[in-house]
Amino acid sequence: MADTFKESPIKSVQVEALVVMKIAKHCSSSFPTIATGSIVGMDNDTLVEVTNSLNFPTVDVANVDSHQSERDASAQAAAAPRSKANLMYQAEMIKHLREVNVDANCVGWYTSATMGNFVTMSFIENQAHYQRENPKAIALVHDVSRSSQASLSLRAFRLSTAFMTALKENKFTTENLQKTKLTYKDILIEMPVVIHNSHLLTTYLHQIPSAPAAGSETTIPTSLAALQREPVNIPPYPSIDSLELSIDPFLEKTCDLLLDSIEAHYTDLNNHQYYQRQMTREQAKITAWQAKRKAENAARAAAKQEPLPDDEWKRLFKLPQEPSRLEGMLNARQVEQYSKQVDGFTANVSAKMFAVRGSLLTE
């Protein structure tokens, strides 16, 4: 492995529809336990083509020792992509794929997530492991909770070159982060995902008869003047469910997770502030000791005696070790992820609340 990491030319990811179905089935069947696996395919200049996937065996919670909780089983499942047994399993399966003349190049791995909660230390370590072996390796994240609402959530990520360099040096101190200008926004790079179907499947989809049109399509006015000039024609099949005023349960859960991440962020911030107070006290003690030793040496010099060593403070005082800022960066990145989800969820809710407010106000 090279000492420096080169910038990856990968700009987008193409995933076969069959692979999407396999990943979705594996993640949903393992829910709420994290599901992980390997993805194989090929890289074509700036495009990664994912043509197959391999499920990693996970620890059955029922067979785990009684002293282990379900959280421990999830932690083992999250660390599965870099375990020695699964790496041997991956190599053996890729060997079998190569024997039947199938794309057998490991291009990354995939994992399941719940409500966008995937920016963890296990995710970073897994992706770093794959990128050390292959700089073009990617990570596919399938959000089971979002996908259960009839909207596929499949995203592709990789670690930035700057973050990989900092992770290799393991220097996540305040001074180093200020020098390299590395922030939580520079941890992950998201790439667009394109679902690819075979020509046979595409032909079949085009042969499926489309549903009959129910009246003319409603045109949404673009301005208030257009609305006053041409009133909107209400379709004969109004969607009453869209007027439901109940708050989306996913919005409530995301807000709870957002508050937990903010609390974890403030805990990390308090730990760093405690370190700064400890460092200030120790440096004040060292400064006082050096001033006292300087006065003693001046008196000894006047008495024509040998001066005492000035570096003895290194043995008497021990400066506190600065805690790593990596956890704080991951928490900040997760807070940003939750904030984007809340922003997306509140679009419909805010419109409903304004509609209710307008109907309650008297003219």
Swiss-Prot record:
It comes from the Eukaryota. One of its GO terms (molecular function) is translation initiation factor activity. PROSITE patterns: MPN. Residues 13-163 form the MPN domain. Coiled coil: none annotated. Its main location: cytoplasm. GO terms for biological process: formation of cytoplasmic translation initiation complex. Keywords: Cytoplasm, Initiation factor, Protein biosynthesis. The keyword Cytoplasm applies. It is found in: Cytoplasm. Component of the eukaryotic translation initiation factor 3 (eIF-3) complex. Component of the eukaryotic translation initiation factor 3 (eIF-3) complex, which is involved in protein synthesis of a specialized repertoire of mRNAs and, together with other initiation factors, stimulates binding of mRNA and methionyl-tRNAi to the 40S ribosome. The eIF-3 complex specifically targets and initiates translation of a subset of mRNAs involved in cell proliferation. This is Eukaryotic translation initiation factor 3 subunit H.
